[in-house]
């Protein structure tokens, strides 16, 4: 009679941003390596881990609801992630949670799991883990986290209080991980962090090593090295430092994708000062023009906040004027929402909700028109598209201008002779304010 040992099962809920997703992947990789099974149902699991988000109040609410659901359905719950930094807030609502840890507390999470659900006898056949680790994204793209934390103290944000100051990963480790991802079939690497352009600042851009070669710990050096892997490299969360200018030529040369996700947040110098953000709109417009002169194919994505405390109609009009002038390709807009612990909560002249709503609508109406015009310029042109999914009706993919989850899509109706991860040439036939339609060339 065979000696079959029980393989302990862990349920896992991952909430929030791609940076949190990477943390979840790391925890899951460790659990699978140790022989735990990861299951999709609460009632099958010996325990549930909830990786939370605590960035804005709606995210806090979603996290608390997910914890409650896991407690109701399973009963044994460990909480980690950003909201875990506010243990009292979680305990007040859910006193029966077993353990709570903050973000990137991987070792603590594993220790707690070992305590409540002891490690299984290691069976290498049950716990085979791919070299690139457990990934929660489709096989053809992956997030590459290059640092943790942030040195900025924007008044609307509490990330530094949750994730701490900037800590850059050694550049050799980052490049080795990127190589493993590419060897595993990844076709697109999405570089993420709290502040990608600050990479290496905390270590004074010291020289690291990869494959025995010296490499400077900086965003530009990282991009130069990633370009050698022969896959799409996309930059996210790029704070508008002057040295961002250094990566634009790499985009123009086709070494990394001509795509910049650069959160500008506002255009009124007064509001930017209240936010503790850099505040020269004229300089930013001049830089955008310069970037486009160097790299005409550049796609610019940004995010903005309307209804920030103290925002007047004049401030808001400056923001609309900036949009008209900058003609950004992809834009997200948030109505200011107070976050517990954020400095902006103490500012006078809070904007009424109905005014926030009205300004958000005006903002989106203008930007949708600009985005539609920018996409219309692509009709008739040929572009490269990476395929994300295929069904009997055709394929859906993304151009170099589209990041997963947050940007638009390219629809290839009737094109079934492709598979996810394929990069194909497409002639654009139609466009709206978000998406493109086309046929394979």
From Swiss-Prot:
Which purpose does this protein serve, as stated in its record?
A: Catalyzes the methylthiolation of an aspartic acid residue of ribosomal protein uS12.
SUPFAM superfamilies xref list: Radical SAM enzymes (SSF102114)
Q: Which residues bind [4Fe-4S] cluster 2?
A: 150, 154, 157
Single GO term (MF):
aspartic acid methylthiotransferase activity
- What residues does [4Fe-4S] cluster 1 bind to? 17, 53, 82
* Record flagged with keyword Membrane: no
**So what family is this one in?**
Belongs to the methylthiotransferase family. RimO subfamily.
The TRAM domain covers 376-441
Q: Which UniProt keywords apply?
A: 4Fe-4S, Cytoplasm, Iron, Iron-sulfur, Metal-binding, S-adenosyl-L-methionine, Transferase
Q: By its UniProt entry, which SMART domains does this protein fall under?
A: Elp3 (SM00729)
Span of the secretion signal?
none
Instruction: Identify the domain of life.
Output: Bacteria
Where is the organism placed in the taxonomic lineage, from the top? Bacteria, Pseudomonadati, Pseudomonadota, Gammaproteobacteria, Enterobacterales
Q: Which ranges carry the MTTase N-terminal domain? A: 8-118
Q: Which organism is it from?
A: Salmonella arizonae (strain ATCC BAA-731 / CDC346-86 / RSK2980)
Concerning Gene3D superfamilies, the annotation shows: Methylthiotransferase, N-terminal domain (3.40.50.12160), Nucleic acid-binding proteins (2.40.50.140), tm_1862 like domain (3.80.30.20)
GO cellular component terms? cytosol
Which one GO biological process term can you cite for this protein? tRNA modification
Protein name, please?
Ribosomal protein uS12 methylthiotransferase RimO
Q: EC annotation?
A: 2.8.4.4
Localization, UniProt: Cytoplasm
| Radical SAM core domain ranges (all copies) | 136-373
